[in-house]
Amino acid sequence: MPGTKRYQHVIETPEPGEWELSGYEAAVPITEKSNPLTRNLDKADAEKIVKLLGQCDAEIFQEEGQIVPTYQRLYSESVLTTMLQVAGKVQEVLKEPDGGLVVLSGGGTSGRMAFLMSVSFNQLMKGLGQKPLYTYLIAGGDRSVVASREQTEDSALHGIEELKKVAAGKKRVVVIGISVGLSAPFVAGQMDYCMDNTAVFLPVLVGFNPVSMARNDPIEDWRSTFRQVAERMQKMQEKQEAFVLNPAIGPEGLSGSSRMKGGGATKILLETLLLAAHKTVDQGVVSSQRCLLEILRTFERAHQVTYSQSSKIATLMKQVGISLEKKGRVHLVGWQTLGIIAIMDGVECIHTFGADFQDIRGFLIGDHSDMFNQKDELTNQGPQFTFSQDDFLTSILPSLTETDTVVFIFTLDDNLTEVQALAERVREKCQNIQALVHSTVGQSLPAPLKKLFPSLISITWPLLFFDYEGTYVQKFQRELSTKWVLNTVSTGAHVLLGKILQNHMLDLRIANSKLFWRALAMLQRFSGQSKARCIESLLQAIHFPQPLSDDVRAAPISCHVQVAHEKEKVIPTALLSLLLRCSISEAKARLSAASSVCEVVRSALSGPGQKRSTQALEDPPACGTLN
């Protein structure tokens, strides 16, 4: 409610909204709910899409409201207190680095964020002449950083084995497990293992659902559900032997797309507490709440500065949409860690939108020799694992066409001679060359370089006078800003292409168990039919043309995922079959003849005899079995 905010904010955060009401999609976790702000996202133009997604991102900084039930938020006293406690535990490792380690771990987007942050904080420590103490784990290994391999996060044992390898011989290990929806088995196994070995390990769980909404279906290779693991951690938190950091940040602008707000909030929360730990460790004091609030406000400022460029972001979105509509390709060429953000955005479009890996791709310009755990995993693995400057020059530049779009992403502190030389080579092949440029007050883009870009988004940051660790605030701001711009552009471009129904992505690839349950929830939502009927239709679409046997029906979810993640249009096929009461083959034929997946589904939804609520879900599709 107005006037209830405890802290002074840089941006105008939304008041608590409809999604907080106890009856709103009650069967669905917050991270999987549909956001009321974007209910009509599919009807919005580019400018409106930017505005709506910007409002969703602002919800990260929203304080607790007066509506019951009240979820704890990023600025809640309980969350800030836990952040300080975790920062103190990290400081213990920093003060006695011999035998110490900080592990950041996750699957998919969360694992890529773990990679990015471990790179950043190791760079920070090297700059101080200190031995780097951070490492990362990502489900599926280093190949999952640069390619879509979301199915690898479904094994708890895989997570434990990877943790044992990096922690071998260490005396004190802080393990920060990131799972936006509190659902990834890869992380659950690690947290359980840490709680069984507290003499060495301190587990910290980061996610954005209440523990009561953590996934509660059985993990195929583990003894506990994710919810049981999280509940155990809550009990151990009383003795500070484990911690759970799980503020609510509201539903995603595109339902369930945790690469967006979930990824951004992960970055904000962890960089705030880790930077606070580093800033105060030499002063011999534990980080203060004031220190946390100062850093959080700089991230709020990043939101303000980024979305002040909304009209230019919309222009870039439209250009990217045009390229994709014409079957062209979009190349995001980023310098240093901005290149990592670019790679992440491209990779995540594959399972989110059912995109081809070549549709939107990121490339990293700069030295990455000491970033990866196992760089050999990325050598000679095929075109979908290419991401370097050499890869761009040899495999992309020669084949650029006029339907492609190339976006340069850099700061004015980067090597501008190098930027200009590459931009000139690209301009010889392709006129659709854009730029996202970060500068500090007083810096200006050289005229010869500026002329190369017909359109550019120029984001100017205020001067910050911080100590050495504090200079990383601006680096983190620029990364977050770049993430917001690219996520908004790639999401919006797919909205403009007609890929979205309301604020749901129907044509996502079912790449892991989380996406299997999301697919089932969408079928229930839009068909209004029973859970059993929706399961039957989903399995028929997955295994087509093979008929469903009782053995197939009884198979573990991992077996269905293994088949589904190689197939396209599984969910639309199943939904059409339900809506039209037709066979899978007839549904596939209708989709093949249609210009847009969502248009043919809309037509079926508005057909005679279709009586259903698109808001109502029957039972939570997280029961653990398909019976």
UniProtKB/Swiss-Prot annotation:
<dbReference type="GO" id="GO:0001678">
    <property type="term" value="P:intracellular glucose homeostasis"/>
</dbReference>
<dbReference type="InterPro" id="IPR054017">
    <property type="entry name" value="GKRP_SIS_2"/>
</dbReference>
<comment type="subunit">
    <text>Interacts (fructose 6-phosphate bound form) with GCK.</text>
</comment>
<dbReference type="GO" id="GO:0030246">
    <property type="term" value="F:carbohydrate binding"/>
</dbReference>
<keyword id="KW-0677">Repeat</keyword>
<keyword id="KW-0539">Nucleus</keyword>
<feature type="binding site">
    <location>
        <position position="348"/>
    </location>
    <ligand>
        <name>beta-D-fructose 1-phosphate</name>
    </ligand>
</feature>
<feature type="binding site">
    <location>
        <position position="514"/>
    </location>
    <ligand>
        <name>beta-D-fructose 1-phosphate</name>
    </ligand>
</feature>
<dbReference type="GO" id="GO:0005829">
    <property type="term" value="C:cytosol"/>
</dbReference>
<dbReference type="InterPro" id="IPR046348">
    <property type="entry name" value="SIS_dom_sf"/>
</dbReference>
<comment type="function">
    <text>Regulates glucokinase (GCK) by forming an inactive complex with this enzyme. Acts by promoting GCK recruitment to the nucleus, possibly to provide a reserve of GCK that can be quickly released in the cytoplasm after a meal. The affinity of GCKR for GCK is modulated by fructose metabolites: GCKR with bound fructose 6-phosphate has increased affinity for GCK, while GCKR with bound fructose 1-phosphate has strongly decreased affinity for GCK and does not inhibit GCK activity.</text>
</comment>
<dbReference type="GO" id="GO:0019900">
    <property type="term" value="F:kinase binding"/>
</dbReference>
<dbReference type="Pfam" id="PF20741">
    <property type="entry name" value="GKRP-like_C"/>
</dbReference>
<dbReference type="GO" id="GO:0019210">
    <property type="term" value="F:kinase inhibitor activity"/>
</dbReference>
<feature type="binding site">
    <location>
        <begin position="179"/>
        <end position="181"/>
    </location>
    <ligand>
        <name>beta-D-fructose 1-phosphate</name>
    </ligand>
</feature>
<protein>
    <recommendedName>
        <fullName>Glucokinase regulatory protein</fullName>
    </recommendedName>
</protein>
<dbReference type="GO" id="GO:0005654">
    <property type="term" value="C:nucleoplasm"/>
</dbReference>
<comment type="similarity">
    <text>Belongs to the GCKR family.</text>
</comment>
<dbReference type="GO" id="GO:0009750">
    <property type="term" value="P:response to fructose"/>
</dbReference>
<feature type="region of interest" description="Important for interaction with GCK">
    <location>
        <begin position="199"/>
        <end position="200"/>
    </location>
</feature>
<dbReference type="GO" id="GO:0009749">
    <property type="term" value="P:response to glucose"/>
</dbReference>
<dbReference type="GO" id="GO:0005739">
    <property type="term" value="C:mitochondrion"/>
</dbReference>
<feature type="binding site">
    <location>
        <begin position="109"/>
        <end position="110"/>
    </location>
    <ligand>
        <name>beta-D-fructose 6-phosphate</name>
    </ligand>
</feature>
<feature type="binding site">
    <location>
        <begin position="109"/>
        <end position="110"/>
    </location>
    <ligand>
        <name>beta-D-fructose 1-phosphate</name>
    </ligand>
</feature>
<keyword id="KW-0496">Mitochondrion</keyword>
<feature type="binding site">
    <location>
        <position position="153"/>
    </location>
    <ligand>
        <name>beta-D-fructose 1-phosphate</name>
    </ligand>
</feature>
<dbReference type="GO" id="GO:0070095">
    <property type="term" value="F:fructose-6-phosphate binding"/>
</dbReference>
<dbReference type="GO" id="GO:0141089">
    <property type="term" value="F:glucose sensor activity"/>
</dbReference>
<dbReference type="GO" id="GO:0046415">
    <property type="term" value="P:urate metabolic process"/>
</dbReference>
<dbReference type="GO" id="GO:0034504">
    <property type="term" value="P:protein localization to nucleus"/>
</dbReference>
<feature type="domain" description="SIS 1">
    <location>
        <begin position="90"/>
        <end position="286"/>
    </location>
</feature>
<dbReference type="GO" id="GO:0005737">
    <property type="term" value="C:cytoplasm"/>
</dbReference>
<dbReference type="GO" id="GO:0019904">
    <property type="term" value="F:protein domain specific binding"/>
</dbReference>
<dbReference type="GO" id="GO:0004857">
    <property type="term" value="F:enzyme inhibitor activity"/>
</dbReference>
<dbReference type="Pfam" id="PF22645">
    <property type="entry name" value="GKRP_SIS_N"/>
</dbReference>
<keyword id="KW-0963">Cytoplasm</keyword>
<dbReference type="GO" id="GO:0006006">
    <property type="term" value="P:glucose metabolic process"/>
</dbReference>
<dbReference type="InterPro" id="IPR040190">
    <property type="entry name" value="MURQ/GCKR"/>
</dbReference>
<feature type="region of interest" description="Essential for interaction with GCK">
    <location>
        <begin position="463"/>
        <end position="465"/>
    </location>
</feature>
<feature type="domain" description="SIS 2">
    <location>
        <begin position="320"/>
        <end position="499"/>
    </location>
</feature>
<dbReference type="Pfam" id="PF22198">
    <property type="entry name" value="GKRP_SIS_2"/>
</dbReference>
<dbReference type="GO" id="GO:1901135">
    <property type="term" value="P:carbohydrate derivative metabolic process"/>
</dbReference>
